[in-house]
Amino acid sequence: MSIVHLQSVEILNAEASFKDPYVFKITFECISPLQDDLEWRLVYVGSAGDEKYDQELDTCMVGPVPVGVNSFEFEAAAPSPSKIPPEDLLGVTVILLTASYRDQEFIRVGYYVNNAYESEELRENPPEKVDLTQVRREVLVSKPRVTRFNIKWDDSATASASTQQQGSAEGLTA
């Protein structure tokens, strides 16, 4: 049984320039006191073919977490284009928002992100080198992919880290 229930994730700037930071409003409920902080991370998948291009955009610790409904804003810098293969700068990729307790990930929310030129002319006749000043990102907020992991919370032995539950956005507003 999870002690922390993610209620909603709002991406406050789902459509923005490629170089703009990502801004999230995260709301969750804590049903029992926690001894330690929660860690939230945002990861940008730079290339579907190789994890070495994944970039941790930011991480933040939230705590102490009181029992009840909690909300905070999480801002993470845009990915570093120099760490992304040039052929993967445009097109569809993924961002992953994760939450962990005591180094145990208990939830992961994945969103598709489409990076494309803003103008139709550039989309039809792209320059040889990608001009990121002309690229906009659009996060598909309507269909997040939510994966929940059972973990060991504080002194409870109710969970094992090897089990996981997957689903789309049941009960999660994006």
UniProtKB/Swiss-Prot annotation:
It is found in: Nucleus. GO terms for molecular function: acetyltransferase activator activity; histone binding. Gene3D superfamilies: Histone chaperone ASF1-like. One of its GO terms (biological process) is protein modification process. The keyword Nucleus applies. Its main location: nucleus. Residues 157-168 have a biased composition (Polar residues). One of its GO terms (cellular component) is cytosol. Keywords: Chaperone, Chromatin regulator, Nucleus, Transcription, Transcription regulation. Residues 155-174 are annotated as: Disordered. InterPro entries: ASF1-like, ASF1-like_sf. Interacts with histone H3 and histone H4. PANTHER family: ANTI-SILENCING PROTEIN 1, HISTONE CHAPERONE ASF1. Belongs to the ASF1 family. Histone chaperone that facilitates histone deposition and histone exchange and removal during nucleosome assembly and disassembly. This is Histone chaperone ASF1.
